[in-house]
């Protein structure tokens, strides 16, 4: 085991590559600057102009109709109770053909 006493333990050290130095902590100047920016932005929000709508008249009409149709769909769905909806669904299923039933096959007739 004495042959291994001269072996260097630890990470390899490469030539031309310096060790990464520890970064210094930023002082409170950064925090103070951020707080000032927040305060000034709050003051500017009150003085900003209102939002200018840049949509074309066709786009505005389309959005209005979409909203109207969505409200109609919501009112239509809200008009039926769950019980009524289940009854309608069962009635619909009764009218469908039954594809998955096993057909009766008789060899005698």
Swiss-Prot record:
Coiled coil: none annotated. It is found in: Nucleus. The lineage of its organism: Eukaryota, Metazoa, Chordata, Craniata, Vertebrata. Residues 9-20 have a biased composition (Low complexity). Keywords: Apoptosis, Cell cycle, Nucleus. This is Protein FAM32A-like. The gene is fam32al. GO terms for cellular component: nucleolus. Residues 21-30 have a biased composition (Basic residues). GO terms for biological process: apoptotic process. Belongs to the FAM32 family. Residues 1-48 are annotated as: Disordered. May induce G2 arrest and apoptosis. May also increase cell sensitivity to apoptotic stimuli. The keyword NADP does not apply. InterPro entries: FAM32A (IPR013865). Its main location: nucleus. PANTHER family: PROTEIN FAM32A.
